[in-house]
A protein has these predicted regions:
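Donor nucleotide-activated moiety binding/catalytic core segment of transferases
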Residues: 129, 277-326
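Active-site and donor-binding regions of nucleotide-sugar-utilizing enzymes
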Residues: 1-24, 38-220
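Short, conserved active-site loop motifs that form the nucleotide-linked donor/cofactor pocket
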Residues: 212, 292-294, 349
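Hydrophobic/aromatic beta-strand patches that form the interior of the parallel beta-sheet core
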Residues: 96, 143, 167, 188-190, ...
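Conserved catalytic-core segment of nucleotide-activated headgroup transferases in glycan assembly
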Residues: 77-80, 218-286
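Short, charged, surface-exposed secondary-structure boundary motifs
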Residues: 106-108, 176-181, 199-203, 222-226, ...
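Catalytic binding pocket for nucleotide-activated donors in carbohydrate/polymer assembly enzymes
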Residues: 186, 207, 214, 318-385
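C-terminal amphipathic helix plus adjacent low-complexity
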Residues: 2-23, 361, 366-420
Length: 420
């Protein structure tokens, strides 16, 4: 390795310090940023120091074509990428799924290998674990899941030593304001569609460069090509929010409004599709007291849930995009102060905040049902490239990259440069 290549790790570490400083300054005062920067640096240096003492004595290799690196072990249990895993395995590829452990586990199990390049102490632990992952699995393509991970830059550097590729798979649209979405240090960044690309391009702070690829969603397949809904079934599907949001006052008020509407409208059946991480205690209690409210089983897929509904109520769930793709008219109901990150108001009107507004929107949908179906589909294609072909297009793009070919002409790709 040349001295220039050796210095890549040091250069990357310096750039990461700069990026993390800018992230802090976006939210905190100068003094607050200084305190937090040095607090984080001390924690990282401790991890780096201990990592140097806990390098693996030997590494048993299990080479694969694709390594799917999830953000945490608990994410594997949610099986969000089961369709992608099955599709790639059916094509005959060797795919291994693993997750980023906590620092304590990395140190205890010696999941560390010396980084190929000179790395400052602060980032030694990150670089050493990234080097261990690449040495252990020897993937031809690493599929990364975790937004904002400080492992990503060092995974990319280590992979390049083996002429391998880092692909980041967006697991939702990238239209939200999360600071983690400033991380852009990947070879390829597979995005849902045009709205995601536009949102990333507008960001003032991006670390690293990538090739953004509009593959569509790898979680969407032809199961969302549903027949037009039947208005006469009078069934509304509520898309639940995550457990963290369920604790917030604005979302609790939204749930209460929807429950009150259900109580006053017994001729409509109300189905609740829970967030994968939520036990939906509010709706479980509502289902016990209201005959027209049901919480759907966890194992029921989103496509199966949508098939049972004539329209969908969304608050702040990414699943509204699949609802639109399935041609289900949308009622955007939200009593929180959160920004409408999905641009629902542009398609479905202002957020519904009262019973009167909600009932008026129901009547609007009933009055011109075919037009509302088309409006929902236009909304979906605003966010999704390739519609229900997202899984197929993702697999196709990965096959092309694996074979060293240029991406197909019908899959748009755009260079996404760094800003610092």
């Amino acid at each position: 390795m040349t001295s220039r290549q050796q210095n890549l790790w040091k250069t990357k570490a310096t750039a990461l310090d700069c990026y993390r400083w800018h992230l802090l300054r976006e939210r905190h005062s100068l003094l607050g940023s200084i305190v937090r920067f040095f607090r984080d640096a001390v924690a990282d240096c401790c991890f780096g120091f201990l990592a140097k003492q806990r390098l693996a004595h030997q590494i048993v290799t299990t080479p694969c074509d694709f390594l799917l690196l999830q953000s945490a072990p608990r994410i594997i249990a949610l099986r969000r990428k089961k369709a992608l895993i099955a599709a790639l395995q059916e094509l005959g590829y060797r795919l291994t799924e693993t997750a980023l452990p906590e620092h304590r586990e990395i140190l205890a199990k010696r999941l560390l290998s010396p980084p190929p390049g000179k790395t400052p102490l602060r980032y030694y632990g990150y670089a050493a674990h990234a080097a261990w992952i690449v040495a252990r699995y020897q993937p031809r393509i690493l599929l990364n899941d975790r937004n904002g991970s400080f492992y990503s830059p060092f995974l990319r550097l280590s992979l390049h030593q083996h002429r391998s590729t880092l692909v980041h798979l967006a697991h939702a649209t990238t239209v939200e304001s999360s600071r983690r979405l400033g991380m852009n240090d990947y070879d390829y960044y597979f995005l849902f569609g045009p709205s995601s690309l536009a949102a990333l391009q507008k960001r003032k702070l991006r670390f690293g460069s990538s090739m953004a690829v509009l593959t569509g969603s790898h979680m969407i397949d032809q199961s969302y090509d549903l027949p037009p809904p039947d208005l006469t079934i009078r069934t509304v599907l509520i898309l639940g929010v995550g457990p963290d949001r369920e604790k917030e006052t604005g979302f609790q008020r939204t749930y209460a409004l929807l429950k009150e509407w259900a109580a006053r409208t017994p001729h409509y059946q109300v189905l609740v599709k829970r967030h994968p991480r939520s036990a939906v205690p509010f709706w479980q209690e509502a289902a016990d007291s209201l005959n027209n409210v049901s919480v759907l089983p966890k194992e029921l897929t989103l496509a199966q849930a949508l098939e049972r509904a004539c329209c969908v109520v969304n608050i702040m769930s990414n699943a509204v995009i699949e609802a639109g793709l399935a041609g289900r008219p949308v009622l955007y109901c939200n009593l929180s102060n959160d920004r409408d990150i999905f641009a629902q108001e542009a398609f479905f009107g202002p957020a519904l905040r009262t019973l009167e507004e909600f009932q008026s929107r129901i009547k609007e949908i009933e009055a011109d049902f075919p037009a509302e179906i088309e409006k929902a589909r236009r909304f979906a294609f605003f966010h999704l490239a390739h519609g229900s072909q997202g899984l197929n297009k993702t697999c196709q793009a990965l096959e092309y990259l694996l074979s060293g070919k240029a991406l197909p002409n019908d899959i748009e790709s755009v260079a996404l440069s760094e800003t610092i």
